[in-house]
């Protein structure tokens, strides 16, 4: 009964209104408000502040600054293996495997279209036909910045408007095409092993998504917005392996896509396995 009520609420609640309200609260600078929020969150999720660059929780100007906090330089070492594909974030592997018939596995009985995930872009979807994917759910208690799995040059960024369902096991198993229905930011890169997509998927109370090259992405609502990065439009953006790509103002999910025969996932990398940013999750085939 509890699960049914939760799922019913997912369909009835005003997703965007709640997320905007959460965003305003998370940016509040009133000391007693933001300190209460930060302390309650840190206590509930047992956040380890010893790894943070600023260890005192109340030193952050607002909750979002705390949530997207930087870590000490040695807190997330990068796997030095040549060709290693790095985990883009702290969290857990939700699913990983092959892209079959243009679809990505979501949960038992559910999958979603790569083309829909990428905002209906047929050409981009074709480049991942027969490829591989990994879905990483960001853990609330850990680090909330997203980093590059491989070095790459940004080719295109696509903002796809949509719903803001919560992202968890229950919704993954019960909301068809969850990740292709939620609002998301698609980042398409050229890498040494071919095309790579890094898709930042929003969720309920995820107030915004930010990238290091464009800041907070706030396109017109209800419209798919595309940015090309080449000499004719925006300057090319080159990011090294392990470099910060962006961050969630509150967390959600990152989906990685690679082309056919381009990656081999690490043995023993099981669904729900815990990850740290910078750990190797696979090996690239150049």
Swiss-Prot record:
InterPro entries: PS_Dcarbxylase (IPR003817), PSD-B (IPR033177), PSD_type1_pro (IPR033178). The modification Pyruvic acid (Ser) is found at residue 252. Is synthesized initially as an inactive proenzyme. Formation of the active enzyme involves a self-maturation process in which the active site pyruvoyl group is generated from an internal serine residue via an autocatalytic post-translational modification. Two non-identical subunits are generated from the proenzyme in this reaction, and the pyruvate is formed at the N-terminus of the alpha chain, which is derived from the carboxyl end of the proenzyme. It is a peripheral membrane protein. One of its GO terms (cellular component) is plasma membrane. It is an enzyme of class 4 (lyase). It catalyses: a 1,2-diacyl-sn-glycero-3-phospho-L-serine + H(+) = a 1,2-diacyl-sn-glycero-3-phosphoethanolamine + CO2. Binds 1 pyruvoyl group covalently per subunit. Pathway: Phospholipid metabolism; phosphatidylethanolamine biosynthesis; phosphatidylethanolamine from CDP-diacylglycerol: step 2/2. Its main location: membrane. The active site is at residues 90, 147, 252. The record marks 251-252 as: Cleavage (non-hydrolytic). Its cofactor is pyruvate. Keywords: Cell membrane, Decarboxylase, Lipid biosynthesis, Lipid metabolism, Lyase, Membrane, Phospholipid biosynthesis, Phospholipid metabolism, Pyruvate, Zymogen. Pfam families: PS_Dcarbxylase (PF02666). One of its GO terms (molecular function) is phosphatidylserine decarboxylase activity. Belongs to the phosphatidylserine decarboxylase family. PSD-B subfamily. Prokaryotic type I sub-subfamily. Heterodimer of a large membrane-associated beta subunit and a small pyruvoyl-containing alpha subunit. This is Phosphatidylserine decarboxylase proenzyme. It comes from Azotobacter vinelandii (strain DJ / ATCC BAA-1303). The gene is psd.
């Amino acid at each position: 009964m509890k699960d049914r009520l939760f799922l019913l609420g997912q369909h009835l609640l005003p997703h965007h209104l709640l997320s905007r309200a959460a965003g305003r609260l998370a940016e509040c600078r009133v000391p007693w408000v933001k300190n209460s929020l930060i302390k309650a969150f840190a206590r509930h999720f047992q956040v380890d502040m010893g790894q943070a660059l600023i260890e005192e929780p109340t030193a952050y100007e607002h909750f979002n600054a705390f949530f997207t906090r930087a870590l000490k330089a040695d807190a997330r070492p990068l796997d030095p293996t040549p060709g290693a594909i790095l985990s883009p974030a702290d969290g857990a592997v939700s699913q990983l495997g092959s892209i079959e018939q243009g679809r990505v596995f979501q949960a038992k009985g559910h999958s979603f279209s790569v083309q829909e995930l990428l905002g209906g872009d047929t050409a981009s979807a074709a480049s991942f036909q027969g490829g591989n994917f990994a879905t990483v759910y960001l853990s609330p208690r850990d680090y909330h910045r997203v980093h590059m799995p491989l070095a790459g040059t940004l080719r295109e960024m696509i903002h796809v408007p949509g719903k803001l369902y919560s992202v968890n096991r229950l919704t993954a198993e019960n909301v068809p095409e969850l990740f292709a229905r939620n609002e998301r930011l698609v980042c398409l890169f050229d890498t040494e092993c071919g095309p790579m997509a890094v898709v930042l998927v929003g969720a309920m109370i995820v107030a915004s998504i930010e990238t290091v090259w464009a800041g907070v992405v706030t396109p017109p609502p209800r419209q798919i917005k595309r940015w090309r990065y080449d000499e004719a439009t925006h300057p090319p953006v080159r990011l090294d392996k392990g470099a910060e790509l962006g961050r969630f103002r509150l967390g959600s999910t990152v989906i990685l896509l690679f082309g056919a025969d381009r990656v081999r996932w690490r043995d023993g990398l099981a669904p729900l396995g815990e990850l740290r940013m910078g750990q190797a999750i696979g090996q690239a085939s150049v």
